Amino acid sequence: YAEEALQHALTAGAVAAAVQIVARYRCELTNEEQWQRLDRWVRLFPPEVSGREPELLLAEVWFMINRQHLAGIPPLLDRVEAVLAQGAIEAATARRLLGEVEIRRATLYFYAGDHVRSLTAAAAALEKVPVEWWLLRAQARLFLSAGYQAQGDLERAYATLYAVDEPAQGLAAQMRLLVDACFIHWMAGDLGGVIQAATQILTHSDELGSQVETITWARYHLAACHFARNELAEAERLLALNIRQRYQSHMQCYVNGAAALALTYEVQGQTDKAREVVAQMVAYTLEIGGAVGHAAAKAFEAELSLRQGRLAEAVNWAEQSDVPLTIPRPLFYRPPVTLAKILLAQNTPASRQQAGQVLAQFHHYAASIHHTSVVIEVLATEALLYSLEDRQEAALTALEQALALAEAGRFIRVFVDLGEPLARLLAKLGHAWGNSPFIARILAAFPQTVPPADARRLANTALLSPLSARELDVLALLSQHYTDNEIAAKLVITADTVHSHVQHIAQKLGVRGRRTIVQTAKDQGLLE
């Protein structure tokens, strides 16, 4: 009905009435995440009208935010502020529109790395935007929370989203705040928090109706965690759903999700599928336009080229690209790390020096804004650099720091994807850490890039007291449910000796009972 009324008004030349129709429904459509529908409405107006009306301009800005056409946004916001400064718009409406302008400026400040101004603008927006415009308020709270997180005040960051002291606006509003929380948990390296929030959203997906953006963000966040923990089947399932809804998704949600899906295929040996996803990503970002999405797609194209052994293609991107190192990278894919890995793959003194400079600058920035998930990846990559330079002590120190940050969230793939050199470092570090289930779990994931026998050997060396060859033989037969007498016959030893070996295995693994021994050995990569 509303769209029909809008078209009738425009056909009749009643432009002011048409603008009022958009204004009347914009709150509802905004809360329902109907940014594409609003954009269609705006395009029905002549450019001279859409270019001067704040309601239409801000609808266009929202569309541009979701498509990541960021460069064109500031002039539109300036135009809105100029109209509001004339004082012709009713005071309450003008205040709400100004609050929306401040939300969009908070967004731009965040992407530019200016967290202080982003936080300030978001706080000002919350003072102006009415509670019934709850999606706008949720967006303001995201950047307010991110500002606190960048200052290291994680408690206040979470309180901004989880302890909202204002009238409840329903399930969809609550779920949108959980989407915001996913971003903060991810940046803080708290995969468990992301999983809890995203799972809660998806539990209510049938009730959320038109909230496609909320659902796609939740799927993306959950899948990113599954990939990080090497739970590839579930990551693939969620991401495959998302890329089918790319036209309804935020550009960053699509690009980062497609990157994660391509890697999920790649690490499972499905290289053709990985290339198909990346080709689609590059084509889509060209179709939609906007430098931000396309730059990320091309960077990830180079990442995949590197992983698939096409170093010349990857180097070509690295030599032609200017990758900013001091802007936030709050999502799955981080182009600065790709740049560093390409330089490391070239493995010349000059390229290693340049890689070190990239990693050091990116590390310093990420640490300064408390983006723990980024710091984990950078530290692991720095460990690889130091290993290439035969600086073993520095390599082990960097890796130990990465593991200390990664263990609570159970990050796995960030280490595995750096290959066998990191597996060797992990095995060495295992001796210093003692009987570390976390290191063993990471080493157990290496068979995708390391032969299974080598992976089991590395997992064993990570134990404080590695199992002897005979103990490994006994363990293998235990896993096949052999009795002591059967093991004794198989290995040509006495049953008492078998019993002694089992006790020693249990002591070294820190567990009791045969079933627990076998399960722990599997978890730690000692058994297939």
Predicted features along the sequence, with ranges:
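Tandem amphipathic alpha-helical repeat scaffolds
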Residues: 19-28, 55-70, 97-113, 135-153, ...
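Regulatory hinge/linker segments at domain boundaries
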Residues: 444-476
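TPR-repeat structural position
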Residues: 2, 15, 35, 70, ...
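Recognition helix of helix-turn-helix DNA-binding domains
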Residues: 473, 481-516, 520
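Extended alpha-helical scaffolding segments used for macromolecular assembly and cargo binding
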Residues: 1-67, 72-76, 354
